[in-house]
Amino acid sequence: MDIIQHGGDPQVGNLATPINASAFSKAFINNLPGYRQGLSAQRRGLEVGMAHGYFLYGPFALLGPLRNADFAGVAGLLGTVGLISLLTLALSLYGSVGVSTPTATLTTPNPPENLGTKEGWSEFAAGFLIGGCGGALVAYGLCIALPMMYTI
């Protein structure tokens, strides 16, 4: 009984283990915005950016060097927007060097084709910037509004 099989071509090095070849793992990975079918590149970037902007706000606001200042929330917002801008620049640079079409693997048998072009990466980066700044603004708004709601 051999539990670990090669995932198609043994020379590729993608082993089919009980973890990555399970139906749960495949369904989980294929429902992430990067691999979900039917999304445009800009929509993928928007969803990924919203998640990153939202969860990057907390460390900047609560653990940053200005955490004890009165304007820690604004400093966290500006730090998050700055990092999202740098990440957008990195995505744009990656897309401009000429990417190849995504390869199909064991966990993602149908990778999105629109991330195999410069235009697709440009749209992804634009959506990431908008989504990241929006996610940071939502997190900032929640941190500002929640203490006011506790007084009610």
From Swiss-Prot:
The family database entries (InterPro entries) matched by this protein are listed as: PSI_PsaL, PSI_PsaL_sf, PSI_suXI
Chief localization? membrane
Q: What is an annotated GO biological process for this record, any one?
A: photosynthesis
Instruction: Provide the leader sequence positions.
Output: none
Q: Which GO terms describe its cellular component?
A: photosystem I reaction center; plasma membrane-derived thylakoid membrane
Topology with respect to the bilayer = Multi-pass membrane protein
Task: State its location(s).
Answer: Cellular thylakoid membrane
Which Gene3D superfamilies is this protein grouped with? Photosystem I PsaL, reaction centre subunit XI
Q: Which UniProt keywords apply?
A: Membrane, Photosynthesis, Photosystem I, Thylakoid, Transmembrane, Transmembrane helix
Please name one Pfam family that this protein belongs to.
Answer: PsaL
Regions crossing the membrane = 71-91, 124-144
Q: Which family does it belong to?
A: Belongs to the PsaL family.
Name the record gives this protein: Photosystem I reaction center subunit XI
Native species: Picosynechococcus sp. (strain ATCC 27264 / PCC 7002 / PR-6)
Q: Which gene encodes it?
A: psaL
